[in-house]
Structures are given as C-alpha cells and as structure tokens.
Amino acid sequence: MNKKDLKMRPVGNEYLEQYNALLRYVFQVTDQELSSVGWQEKEIIRAKFPTMQKADVIGWFDGDTLVSQVAVYPMRVKVFGKTYSMGGLTGVGTYPEYSNLGLMHKLLEQALKNMREKKQYICYLYPYSIPYYRRKGWELISDKISYEIKDYQLPKNHQVAGSVRRVKADGEELKETYARFAEHTHGAILRDELAWNEYWLWDRDDIMAAIYYNENEEPDGYIIYWIENEVFYIKDMIFNHEEARTGLWNFVSAHFSMIDRVEGSTYTDEPLAFLLEDASIKESISPYYMARIVDFPAFVADYPFKADGTEREWRFSMTDPIMECNQGSFLLKISKDGRGTAVKISEPCADSISIQTMTTMLMGYKRPDYLAKIGRIHAGGETIDMLEDAIEQQPPYISDYF
C-alpha cells in the first residue's frame, strides 16, 4: 500500500455509513451485541447523524473509501472550578491493511491542531490502548472502581431530611441534577445534548433512574440502574453531599427482598468499602480516562493555581511527541492570587517534564511529590514543594463514555 495514493480530508455526513462500518470492524461490534442493547444497524446510523454534524471528523481516503479516521466532539469540562472548552477524541480506527503507514499519527496531529485553533486546550479520550496514547502525549487522569455488594452487606436505613423519587431516565429532571453536580465537580463534563446522547447510546431500553430531593425539593443526587436476574446494577450514582448519598443508598437497600447482590461502578477516588459497616466487599480499580494538554501556555493562562503570599517561578524543559507549542524550555510564573503565565525561553533548563506528566499533575490525578519520586519530574525539592502547594488536591470525576 502506497501512502501517496491516500488523501487526508474532512469526513462529511455522506460518509456516515463508512464511518460506522470502520468502527464496527476495528472494535469488533457484532449484530448480536447491537441487538442486546436494542439497536439495529440503521438505528445506530440515525443516532450518530446529529453527533457527526457537530463533530470535527477527519480521515484518510483511498479513492472514495474511508480507511482511517478520528472524530473530535466539542465539549466543556470543569477544571478546579474553571470551565474549559475540551476536545473529546473518539471514533479512532484504521483498517489493518492500511496500518504501519503513519496515518493515525498524522490524523492525531491534525486533530490537535484543529483543537488548538478552536481554543480547546484540553483533550479527553477513552483509550483502547493506554501505551499507544501515552506515546502520543496522553496520560491517565481518572479511575473507575467496580464493586459487588451482597444483599446482607447493604447499608442499613438511615433517616434523611429529603426523599428519593423514580423519574424518567431521559427526562429533564435528571439533566438538571447532573448539571448541579457537575458545576462544582473537578473534571466533570458539562453535558450538552451531544454529551448526553453519547452517555446513553449503548444503554439498555429498561434502564431506570431515581433522584434524591433535599428538604427544599432541590435535586441533590441521582442513581441510574437496572435490575436483572436478582442483581441490582448501578450504572452511575452522583451526590452533592453525604445526606444525598445516604438517601440514595437507602433506596438501593429498599430492594433487599428483590435482589441477591448489587454490582456497580463509581468514578471518585474514594473506595466504597470504608463507608460500609460490612466492608468485606469486592472492589477492583482500573484506569478510565486519559487526557492531554493541547496548548500548554494557553491552558495555564486560565488554570486556577492556589493563591499564596509570594510569586512563584519554575524554569523547565518539556517534551511533547506531537505539538511544537509544548516543546522546549519554559518559564512558568504563578502570581500571588494564583494566576499562571507560561512563556518559552531560549536558555536550557536543568528541570524537565513531559506533556504527559504535566497533564496528569495539573489535572490532579497524581501529585508532584509522587511524580518526582518515580522519575517523571526532574526538579529540586524546593520546586516540588512549590508545585505541591500550588496545585489543588482532587482527582477528576469522569463518568461519561464516548
């Protein structure tokens, strides 16, 4: 296969069937898997059409045949209280006969350049290969904790001021509840119609939801779930405070006579076992989302560092396998009130870091002290202490899937 015969260009809506066919081939999505969640092939295409219209999709073509592709969804996320435009990378795939031609590297490079032009200075993705995306500049920023609780281990009922009511899973009440939660949750995606469409896309028809309302009738949390074969499956549970969490678990425990166990996932950094009276439950942790900073100086300009009594500086060199704007020596200045500026400088620097490590550090997933200990940051002790004091301590919450 000769790369000279291939052309890279935007993928229009007329190629939607080819787009989906490529994804189904690469990720081995069968008709049986589609039907298990109530989908038919044509329904998937219709469901994806509105999303494709909003996305930035680029691909390589062999004549009129789409052979490699990436898509970027326009999204917004919260980073320590600051709202950022984010590029959600998805739809990544190449037919095997076109592999080893460097097609995907070029697509990722172009996608990142497009994000930069659109001021999307942070990019999220769900990785099919963590090593591959690490080589391209992404790094882990969140975890998923899966758990299994036997019926006799469910928490006992505790009195709360509010109440739980079942609602339509696709209703506005659920969206309002999530919006209240995401507004103050670090890392959370601020879901618009596109993000909600992706959130529900692969769910079953019989999925259910319930909302916890506080004593002022304000929605302070929800649970999304289904029940099958005497198992209570929790897709997601969010809550703004401990009272809402307790109220939602009261609701789960009320199903005691109907179920043998509860299986679910949580996307916080807090294992569930410690909160239960019978803590001997099954829990497993796995990496979930990755991210990469697209344009470091632009990202830092909006980043909310912690305020301090003094101005702080750090000179360092940074590597990035794709984006030139993130390569070279930098001077990072942090003002007393926590405003950051980063400019390129010409002199060489003793301290060094990669864009991968910078991303996971500034997103709060791993701390500077830990990253220095494992050799991911090369800097003196005073610099590491300064970074520890300057960066908020809270891993991102991401429960989306796209």
Where does each model-flagged region fall?
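Conserved acetyl-CoA-binding loop-helix of GNAT-fold acetyltransferases
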Residues: L89-K113, E242-S253
